[in-house]
Amino acid sequence: MSRRVCLALDLVDDADLIADYERAHAPGAVWPEVTRGIRDKGFTDMEIWRVADRLVMIAQVADDWPRDLDAEGRAVDTRWEAAMDHFQRPLSCAGDGEKWVPMRRIYSLGEQAG
């Protein structure tokens, strides 16, 4: 089984940095070991959407998400996160050390009458 999660994060509001961030996430640009690590953490699908300087991640995750990575996976994850840090700006509601903040679903068409 899997479930959908949505997370939010802001980017530094700088057009050049935003363009660089998008290039870093273009097909083939993300390090293969990062992609493997994402899957190893329990993500079965993931998309990142952007409007202005706001990012929204929509992901399907395994029921046991988030999974811990092995030492090698943690090292790669740490390097990737460090490479992305200068692009990203946590939301004001983020906790200490938190970047991607989970969002709460407030509406579902399938749950509506009619």
Question: What is each PLM-predicted segment?
Answer:
Residues 4, 52-56:
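A generic structural signal for beta-strand entry/edge sites
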Residues 4-10:
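Active-site-flanking beta-strand signature of metal-NTP-handling nucleotidyl enzymes
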Residues 14-15, 54-55, 62-67:
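Short, charged/polar surface micro-motifs in flexible loops or helix N-caps
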Residues 17-42:
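Short amphipathic alpha-helical segments
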Residues 41, 62-99:
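An amphipathic, aromatic/His-enriched active-site/gating alpha helix that lines ligand/cofactor pockets
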Residues 46-51:
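Short beta-strand
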Residues 94-114:
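Short, low-order "capping/linker" segments at domain edges
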